[in-house]
Amino acid sequence: MYKFKTIYISYDGMTDPLGQSQVIPYLLGLSKHNIEIHLISFEKAEKYSNKKHHIENLFIDSNIIWHPLKYHQKPPVISTLLDIWHLRKKVNEILIKNNISLVHCRSYISALVGGSLKKDKGIPFIFDMRGFWADERVDGNIWNLKNPLFKIIYNFFKAKEKQFIIQSDKIVSLTNNAKNEILNWQLNGINNSKIQVIPCCADLNHFSLYAINAVQLKSLQKMLAIAEDDFVVSYVGSLGTWYMIDEMMEMFKVLSVKIPKSKFLIVTADEPDIAYNAAKKLNIPKALIVVKKAERSEVPYLIALSKFSIFFIKPSYSKKASSPTKLAEILGMGVPVICNSNVGDVQSIVEEGNVGVVINEFNKAQYEIAIERMIALLPADNISIANYAKKYASLEDGINKYLKIYTDIFNTKSDDRTPL
């Protein structure tokens, strides 16, 4: 029997919520298939201090060896260069002690090292894009291209993006929309088979309507002062940058006029005043807005309280490659959605499954039409919606797709296998 050894590089921390939802579950699944994974991640000091032991416990009895590195935030640019230096050093330490068959690079900073290993040592690497990262930085107003430094950095990473795509052994895209965009670039050697689409999946054992305890649900409802006859709609996630709280609040106002017993349940770790101020601007009574910061274990229950959930994401070029995890989580709970078009594959997913309503513009007329269409879908067929989520975004399906990529690459390196 043989064990394949890989390095998985994430510039996101495992003590961050994203690492815990979008990295660790996949790696735990892959590690059960006789794969030893050396996981390198960059951890923010406070979160690492609070969550270190929790993450270490997750890896007990697995084939995952965690190599946490310190994330440096300041000064800009220089801090990132310092992180890359530490990353290269750690990778070299691992290579000295292990016969590595593959490097899996999550996003662009990681791929800088993966690309070098492919070029210098011939080690295969997966470019797991996660999105058009450089364009996201511009569209999200993080990089102002009027600043010459950011213009240089942007151009550098756009050139690297094409290099990673050509150089990698496999590309993982979150959406078919982004895959088609890449194919339209007509890069040398890039065809349909080189790009695997794996959307952001959800743990549908956790986000499951079957896992809801009715007594706990009633208790939570009472604690939030939500009445039995309240018409609850929810939003789950951040309130800044990409997520359009003002427009979501405008739609809720339209709903509250039509259904006076409406309440807007906002599940977020952000400051509640962001939501309350958005409501105040529209003269929506504060009593209609419920803002709740929740542990991951509570989120399925909060979604389950709602008739439907909404999310509006700022449309932009980079959002062709976006796969909102919240969509899979909400549908996993059997709850329909109202959302907007021009974000990854969201429109096709929602419309093909008849699991909600998609709007094309942000205005009162569109909101009224969307609400009428949603009300026509209610009461929702919760079981059908949950089953549809399993079809397109189950964690098990995502793990199997990654496993197929790994085994295809491993099979080309049969001479590099290390005996157990």
Predicted regions and their residues:
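Carbohydrate-associated surface elements
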Residues: N177, C201
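Conserved donor-binding/catalytic core segment of Leloir-type glycosyltransferases
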Residues: T6-I7, A227-Y243, M248-F252
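N-terminal subdomain of nucleotide-sugar transferases
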Residues: M1-E56, I60-I64, I96-N98, K170-V172, ...
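Membrane-proximal helix-turn-helix segments that form the acceptor-binding/catalytic region
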Residues: K89-E93, L112, S116-D120, W133-D135, ...
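A charged, aromatic-enriched C-terminal amphipathic alpha-helix characteristic of glycosyltransferases
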Residues: E361-Q366, A376-N411
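Nucleotide-activated donor-binding/catalytic signature segment of Leloir-type glycosyltransferases, i.e.
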Residues: V267-T268, D273-Y301
